[in-house]
Design a protein with these regions (language model features):
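Intrinsically disordered, charged and Pro/Gly-enriched terminal/linker segments
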Residues: 25-32, 39-45, 58-68, 72, ...
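Short acidic, hydrophobic short linear motifs in intrinsically disordered regions
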Residues: 47-56
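Short boundary/linker motifs that mark transitions into or out of structured domains
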Residues: 1-32, 84-93
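Glycine-centered, phosphate/nucleic-acid-interacting loop/turn motifs that mediate DNA/RNA or nucleotide
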Residues: 81
């Protein structure tokens, strides 16, 4: 029996599909093969109706004969993957082997574990989980494909996941201390840059700078946060960042 753990799907960054250790994505049909397969994979384990697949591939202007075009696409995709990977006719399901690894799924699971570990103060476990999530979410989902609403929804979800992963990674590095403080600062700076309206990024950056003895710079970060939040949202910094700012002033 072939090992399921040799089956891997990479949707972020370079598109890769390996079945039992063998690359098959080069055999995918035309430009539509990638989004069709990706949509089915991201819907797992749900079976997807043909009308939904047409909407996923051609959201604004389905071609004439789109039902036949979808049938041809599915046939070619089955030829590339093997008939057992795409189950069903009226509805279609991606039936990857048990234990198959999909980068997006792995990132979201790793992120959840990292966030749980942060809450529990298990810094090493949080660090590894957040790093795994960052590795995937820092790369674009299906680059080169545009104008697909479902893809934009998933991209926004992964953008949010990247924010969460950066936050968990910075917190884990702070918890570990020592040489990891530099990593905490880099992650916090990246979070502030990526989402300047997220207060936790500023607090983590202030904490890392204070930990390294740069209290004046940490106070400057608070001022930056105050101005951004005031100008963009019309609010003041929340209690967590405000209280840490007061603590720094008392040092």
């Amino acid at each position: 029996m072939e090992r399921a753990d040799n089956t891997y799907v990479q949707l972020c960054g370079r598109f890769v599909v390996e079945l039992h250790g063998r690359r098959v994505d080069q055999r995918f049909p035309s430009r539509q093969g990638r989004p069709l397969f990706a949509y089915l994979v991201l819907q797992r384990p749900r079976a997807v109706g043909r009308d939904e697949l047409v909407e996923a591939l051609w959201p604004s202007d389905p071609p004439a004969g789109h039902a036949a075009a979808l049938t041809v696409l599915l046939s070619k995709l089955r030829a590339a993957l093997g008939a057992d990977i795409l189950e069903g006719r009226g509805t279609v399901r991606a039936a990857l082997p048990p234990g198959a690894r999909i980068d997006v799924e792995q990132a979201l699971v790793s992120l959840h574990r990292a966030q749980s570990a942060v809450v529990q103060g298990e810094w090493a476990r949080a660090w590894s989980g957040a790093l795994c999530a960052r590795y995937v979410t820092e790369r674009p989902l299906l680059p080169g494909l545009e104008d697909l609403p479902w893809l934009e929804v998933w991209r926004r979800r992964l953008e949010d996941a990247l924010d969460d992963a950066l936050e968990a990674y910075a917190a884990a590095c702070l918890g570990l201390g020592g040489t990891e403080i530099a990593g905490a600062e880099r992650a916090a700076r990246r979070l502030v840059e990526h989402n300047p309206l997220r207060e936790t990024g500023y607090k983590l950056l202030m904490q890392t700078l204070a930990e390294r003895g740069n209290v004046a710079e940490a106070l400057g970060v608070y001022e930056r946060a105050r101005i951004v939040l005031r100008d963009e949202l019309g609010i003041s910094p929340g209690p967590a960042i405000h209280d840490f700012h007061a603590e720094l002033l008392g040092r």
